Design a protein with these regions (language model features):
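Glycine-rich adenosine-cofactor-binding loop
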Residues: 2-18
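Residues at the starts of beta-strands that form the adenosine-phosphate
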Residues: 3, 27-29, 60, 84-85
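Short alpha-helical
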Residues: 11-12, 69-70, 100
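Structural signal for interior beta-strand "rungs" in well-ordered beta-sheet cores
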Residues: 87-203
């Protein structure tokens, strides 16, 4: 399709718009958002998220909402209703031809995706991040700007890796985790854990 609906109208949506324009795949780009009206950089907000069905057969869709859980709920609903969900890949990103990126994901400027990497649905690979060879990144993950992930590592679904964190090779981080900004993971992290620091250590629950 030559038309694109971006769901969401916040900061993440602004970046998605920029990438979509640079990809030159769509001659019309519009937004749906439940809280904002008007336009973003001259591109109109034309309705609310529930209006998606109006554009189902004429537009591609991208869900540009930073919250992993909300993004997954909206995207999974659209997938179940057979909407056309696309990924956005910045032209300056270096993406191996031997990697796999599932629909609804975004790879931002300056990022590197090396061979035999799998990135799940609805995942954010933010600015200047790197994912080395043989890594598996789950669904609806957020890899923040400047994160470096060593080879043969695994990041579970719904996990958020904070700004500038480093994960050495052969590390498994479970699902639904939060890794604090600037952390260095040198050992595995179980699911449903918040961990911070150098080395990255789970925070004790009070």
């Amino acid at each position: 399709m030559e038309k694109l609906v971006i769901i969401g109208a916040g900061g993440h949506a602004k970046v998605a718009l920029d990438i979509a324009i640079l990809m030159h795949n769509w001659n019309e780009i519009v937004f749906l958002d439940d809280y904002k009206t008007g336009e973003i950089f001259g591109y109109p907000i034309i309705g609310k998220i529930n209006d998606s069905h109006i554009y189902k057969y004429s537009h591609d869709f991208f869900v540009a909402i930073g919250d992993n859980q909300i993004r997954s709920e909206i995207q999974n609903h659209l997938i179940n209703e057979d909407f056309s969900i696309i990924s956005l890949l910045h032209p300056s990103a270096t993406i191996s031809i031997f990697s796999k990126i599932e629909r609804g994901s975004i790879v931002m400027a300056g990022s590197i995706i090396n061979p035999n990497v799998t990135i799940g649905q609805g995942t954010i690979i933010n600015t200047n991040s790197s994912v080395d060879h043989d890594c598996n990144i789950g669904d609806f993950v957020h890899i923040s700007p400047g994160v470096a992930i060593g080879g043969t590592s695994s990041i579970g679904s719904y996990t958020w890796i904070g700004l500038g964190s480093n994960i050495i090779n052969n590390i498994t981080i479970g699902s639904d985790c939060i890794i604090g900004a600037g952390s260095v993971a040198v050992s595995d992290i179980n699911s449903n854990v918040t961990a911070v620091g150098v080395p990255c250590t789970p925070i004790e629950k009070s």
